[in-house]
Amino acid sequence: MTVLDFQQVSFIRNQQFLLETINWQVKKNEHWAILGLNGAGKSLLLQLITGTLWPSSGQRTVLGERYGKTSVPDLQRRIGWVSSALQNKFYGRDLAEEIVLSGLYSSIGLYESYDENQLDQAKALLADLGLTHLIHRSYHVLSQGEKQFVMIARAMMAQPEILILDEPCTGLDLFAREELLARLEAFSKLTNTPTILYVTHHTEELLPIFTHLLMLKNGKVHAAGKREAIFTEEVLTTFYDQPILLHPFTGDRIIVTPK
């Protein structure tokens, strides 16, 4: 099954290409990392995936539904999105499990009634991430890393088929980052895990679970495909426009440094 299919997708603003001729396919059972420097077009690409923006040209098919021939709100409910910016929108006194529950309704805060089964589901999602200790704790006392874990559990509450993690380690210290990545790797191995799209510009965050990479550069696809084929010194040197070196990092990860 094709999870995502972009064909000749471009986005123009003020007569300038911000994304140009994007051709990209994601298949079921693939987890992708999207790598790009600031201004490469990563955020625009995500908004085109979720239907928040409309392209200037090209066709987008997501989860078998073609934009323009399907209900955008219905399709958006099948996509989970986690970003650091979302953390600050929630109310500090809400309990962690209440924030997770709000993912059922895509709301900031919990205003709908819920039953015990739904509450148990929220607690189970926290448990899946190894976060049972956060149950009954107020959001405002959580660390930045814990808040990000709660956001991931919230996104999973609606059982999405795609989970977008938009620079989830932003604002985390070294130890919180490593904890988040470890929990994400464990989570990815659970049954019925959605397709994960992980956005970053830090190569050391690229876990082995990411089978494929998309490199965005100046609004264009610089390289896309299986990780082992494109995560090389040769490709990365042209991506960064300067010589680089690859160094082994913890957990079978690799860090890139200037040569």
Predicted regions and their residues:
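Conserved ABC ATPase signature
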Residues: 138-142, 146
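Conserved ABC transporter NBD signature motif
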Residues: 58-68, 75
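ABC ATPase nucleotide-binding domains
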Residues: 239-259
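Helix-to-loop junction immediately C-terminal to a conserved catalytic motif
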Residues: 50
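Conserved ABC ATPase "signature" region
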Residues: 116-134
